[in-house]
């Protein structure tokens, strides 16, 4: 195994700027910049925040549609209609340099060529907040975060008991149903949500009534419990099952392609993630967080007769991550975050009709991030990270 260390330093000085506040002057708290709660006025990097009320007012069903219209320095790409491949660029960097996290779980796809995450299956009814960090975040999140990071937080339970159901219908047999149950008290909270979206879509073929169907069944769940003032358990889970039809491209033969060629390719997808965290706070100024996380992505492509794709492709990517994070607050103006991480990836695909390719790799990382208020108007951040990859070094 190669042993080569990747080192990143980041030093930022910034003038303080007003917090985004409500009528009661409550400061906005963010988590993504340093992996711990802090006021947005102390963040030394460009950040955009989309909260739950924003998503309710937007009326968009897919997260990608929201981000494409409401975030600067963000480029959203989609290859077609609902369910087709999509990705996001931050600060003009290639999409593989913009990492995505859902409830703290890294969501890149080990089975894809560049490892970037596909946004096409994330529905807005499941989201409470999105934090978009723009610019290099490598000292905290690794070399894949040169362009920035997108942090998606799903809904959590609130005190009391709550239930919600919403149904919307439209043309082309389009239906969207979402429902949830949630609740909580002083020691624990829970949330369970389901959403189903389906549509016949709009086909580019004009000579028949062939459909480009898409279906998305999504389920999220969360549970947290505070056992004592020093020990807390947090957990999140997410599953998305999808089905997509799209127009097949006919391969020309001696007689050419029939003008009435109306076959469709099909893609079945399964995407899941979960994380379980134990938080231990032995001191008022010091806390530890231990996390086990997993993501699983599977895609099956079924070819149409006489199409350019001549076989059925089956891709899967599986990642386990073991994470430790420590936080120490020296005082109100100085704090440090440090951690150890190990990610184990497995992937597989069909090279041809008879050969199956499987591969695995791992990366071990150590990092720290120190934040300090120099004066009332200037903040400084210094961070370093070491990555050891089993293949790349």
Predicted feature locations:
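N-terminal periplasmic accessory domains that precede
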Residues: 29-31, 63-70, 86-89, 101, ...
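Transmembrane beta-barrel wall of Gram-negative outer-membrane proteins
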Residues: 169-198, 207-245, 266-283, 330, ...
């Amino acid at each position: 195994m190669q042993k080569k260390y990747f080192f990143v330093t980041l030093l930022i000085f910034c003038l303080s700027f007003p917090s985004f506040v409500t009528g009661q002057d409550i400061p906005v708290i963010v988590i993504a910049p340093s992996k711990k709660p802090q006021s947005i006025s102390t963040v030394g990097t460009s950040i955009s925040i989309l909260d739950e009320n924003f998503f309710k007012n937007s009326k968009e069903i897919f997260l990608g549609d929201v981000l494409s219209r409401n975030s600067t320095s963000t480029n959203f790409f989609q290859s077609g209609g609902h369910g087709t491949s999509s990705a996001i660029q931050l600060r003009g960097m290639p999409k593989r340099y913009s990492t995505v996290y859902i409830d703290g779980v890294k969501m890149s796809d080990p089975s894809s060529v560049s490892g970037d995450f596909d946004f096409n299956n994330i529905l807005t009814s499941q989201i409470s907040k999105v934090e978009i960090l723009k610019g290099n975040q490598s000292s905290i999140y690794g070399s894949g975060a040169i362009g920035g990071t997108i942090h998606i937080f799903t809904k959590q339970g609130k005190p009391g008991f709550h239930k919600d159901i919403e149904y919307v219908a439209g043309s082309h047999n389009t239906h969207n149903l979402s429902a949830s149950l949630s609740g909580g008290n002083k020691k624990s909270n829970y949330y369970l949500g389901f959403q189903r979206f389906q549509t016949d879509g709009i086909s580019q073929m004009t000579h028949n009534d062939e459909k480009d169907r898409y279906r998305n069944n999504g389920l999220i769940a969360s549970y947290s419990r505070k056992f004592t003032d020093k020990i807390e358990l947090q957990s999140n889970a997410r599953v998305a099952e999808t089905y997509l039809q799209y127009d097949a491209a006919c391969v020309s033969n001696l007689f050419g392609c029939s003008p009435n060629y109306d076959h469709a390719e099909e893609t079945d997808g399964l995407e899941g993630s979960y994380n379980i965290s134990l938080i231990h706070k032995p001191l008022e100024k010091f806390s530890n967080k231990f996390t086990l996380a997993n993501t699983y992505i599977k895609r099956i492509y079924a070819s149409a007769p006489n199409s350019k794709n001549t076989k059925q492709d089956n891709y899967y990517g599986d990642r386990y991550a073991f994470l430790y994070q420590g936080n120490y607050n020296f005082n109100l103006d100085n704090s440090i975050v440090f951690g150890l991480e190990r990610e184990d990836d497995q992937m597989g695909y069909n090279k041809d009709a008879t050969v199956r390719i499987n591969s695995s790799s791992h990366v071990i990382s150590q990092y720290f991030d120190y934040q300090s208020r120099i004066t009332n108007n200037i903040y400084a951040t210094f961070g370093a990270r070491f990555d050891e990859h089993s293949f790349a070094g």
